[in-house]
């Protein structure tokens, strides 16, 4: 049965290999793709912050922001502009965490077109060529 809840996914890589990934159904029904991407971005931001703290404990220099690749420009605009009220008035406050970590320059957002979204290997059925390309991008190689 389709409950109309969106599915979000992320993959974090280090040195060309996946070190953290998630595929999760969102807890609420999003009324727009923008809201769904924004909610997914908040979950991704929480994991990014945890990974930054972990890598810092291991001695990694974390002075530069961690880049999140986002394929929804409206979700990016909501993150950067707290006055974007019409689209945000029904978004739960807990999802606005992403604004804080972007504003304090711990994370940065970069627009990446859907065709280049590596995490889509978790959330979508892809054409074989795209599947192989994205699996290679996260360090998974086909065995001969």
Model regions and ranges:
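Acidic, metal-ligating active-site segments
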Residues: 1-16
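RNase H-like nuclease module associated with reverse transcription
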Residues: 6, 18, 24-144
């Amino acid at each position: 049965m389709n409950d109309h809840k969106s599915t979000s996914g992320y993959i974090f890589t280090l040195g060309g290999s996946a070190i953290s990934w998630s595929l999760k159904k969102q807890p609420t029904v999003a009324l727009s793709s923008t809201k769904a991407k924004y909610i997914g971005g908040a979950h991704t931001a929480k994991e990014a912050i945890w990974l930054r703290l972990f890598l810092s404990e291991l001695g990694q220099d974390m002075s530069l922001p961690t880049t999140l690749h986002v394929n929804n420009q409206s979700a990016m605009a909501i993150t950067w502009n707290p006055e974007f009220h019409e689209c945000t008035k029904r978004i739960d406050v807990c999802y606005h965490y992403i604004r804080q970590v972007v504003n304090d320059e711990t994370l940065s957002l970069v627009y990446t077109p859907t065709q280049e979204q590596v995490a889509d290997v978790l959330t979508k059925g892809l054409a074989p060529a795209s599947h192989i390309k994205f699996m290679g991008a996260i360090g998974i190689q086909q065995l001969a």
